[in-house]
């Protein structure tokens, strides 16, 4: 059997929760990818300059980082987590619908910032909730979760494509387009993809990109509805009749019938998980949460976060600057052909996450991480060596997307497993990955402008090597962490008092004495065991 029966049973038990969290990540992917293809239309609609429109997207990335770092605060209860997901996914649909009405760059910046905040909250909550449900079995479900990002990211430009107009260009359109693409990682094709036969001064077919945003708003609308239905099923809506029992109540009843002792332990683990720092990133730094923890606990958080800082940075840098690299010497590809590189990259990421679902079940997470990081470095190295080979640029883009696709979900599952699902790993990792995505793009863009397009590959290779070093540091920290925590657990077992054992057996002894008395009474015997004299 491809997947063992235990995992299928676990998935069936949490099916509605899991599908809901996957659907909100579809919203996340839908929001990530629509910016690139529509950038020139938004620039023309708002009448803004390149510098002004750049700040619009910077506002979205900054608020995405804020939402990621604070989203864990909503995971204290199931109600707050689902309510935050419902509002965030609904906000994304609202933002999609009002973007065509933003004829001012300030209004557009505010709309993008609100959208980024909602995306960050979705990112953190969905990861934490899945880890809390599946724990050691979470890698396969996290891979599927991040597959839905790629699915939404692929669908978004396909919707926008028929409605994009390219007539709002000036004579220096090539220079402007080159500058524009320097700032955005989410472009799936070139924003200056104009037919060569149509002059800029001639009549151009009028297209309304507003329809693209409204269609995406409608496509995203079932997501908040799905979250609302889950809240209803969980009896979390006070104004709705509670006709059916909660889904979790059914599971707890079934588990109670089969193994009450295991249920108590599971409830205890869930309680520990919810109150062990999986909140916002600042709640992880309180004195009570950090007291008595070994130094390896902090090193795992730091090194794991730096791995994602680098890998998510590579994704942002490559998706944002591969077009610029392709149209510049020595590649000098046509803009239409170069614009396909972004779509190939994101398609490879989506396919890689889909393939990683069975792989994460068959292989250890740490082995997948080492293979993926080594593949990223080798691919970037070959791209540097074969920097004039146009065919390998497309092949290398595909392999880079495949290798880097599953690093994020694998590392989240690996670090949470190291910390026994009692740390702040998910919140810290999501926050640092957002910081890397935003920071390294600016750094790489500056180097490309100063040193030329070839520095794009050099920058990617250096970042990849640093990420591999940090991954080895995580593995080494895990080795020492298990030694330290294993020694402390052995000491607790050795020094622990054995007094509670007799107390546990006392009630059993008591019931053993009472039961014969009850039986004797049923047979009409007195307390001394003799029949009462009836005929005397």
From Swiss-Prot:
<feature type="transmembrane region" description="Helical">
    <location>
        <begin position="140"/>
        <end position="160"/>
    </location>
</feature>
<feature type="transmembrane region" description="Helical">
    <location>
        <begin position="53"/>
        <end position="73"/>
    </location>
</feature>
<feature type="transmembrane region" description="Helical">
    <location>
        <begin position="341"/>
        <end position="361"/>
    </location>
</feature>
<feature type="transmembrane region" description="Helical">
    <location>
        <begin position="366"/>
        <end position="386"/>
    </location>
</feature>
<feature type="transmembrane region" description="Helical">
    <location>
        <begin position="211"/>
        <end position="231"/>
    </location>
</feature>
<comment type="similarity">
    <text>Belongs to the major facilitator superfamily.</text>
</comment>
<dbReference type="GO" id="GO:0016020">
    <property type="term" value="C:membrane"/>
</dbReference>
<feature type="transmembrane region" description="Helical">
    <location>
        <begin position="391"/>
        <end position="411"/>
    </location>
</feature>
<feature type="transmembrane region" description="Helical">
    <location>
        <begin position="456"/>
        <end position="476"/>
    </location>
</feature>
<dbReference type="InterPro" id="IPR036259">
    <property type="entry name" value="MFS_trans_sf"/>
</dbReference>
<feature type="transmembrane region" description="Helical">
    <location>
        <begin position="105"/>
        <end position="125"/>
    </location>
</feature>
<feature type="transmembrane region" description="Helical">
    <location>
        <begin position="81"/>
        <end position="101"/>
    </location>
</feature>
<feature type="transmembrane region" description="Helical">
    <location>
        <begin position="297"/>
        <end position="317"/>
    </location>
</feature>
<feature type="transmembrane region" description="Helical">
    <location>
        <begin position="428"/>
        <end position="448"/>
    </location>
</feature>
<keyword id="KW-1133">Transmembrane helix</keyword>
<keyword id="KW-0812">Transmembrane</keyword>
<protein>
    <recommendedName>
        <fullName>Major facilitator superfamily domain-containing protein 4B</fullName>
    </recommendedName>
</protein>
<feature type="transmembrane region" description="Helical">
    <location>
        <begin position="19"/>
        <end position="39"/>
    </location>
</feature>
<keyword id="KW-0472">Membrane</keyword>
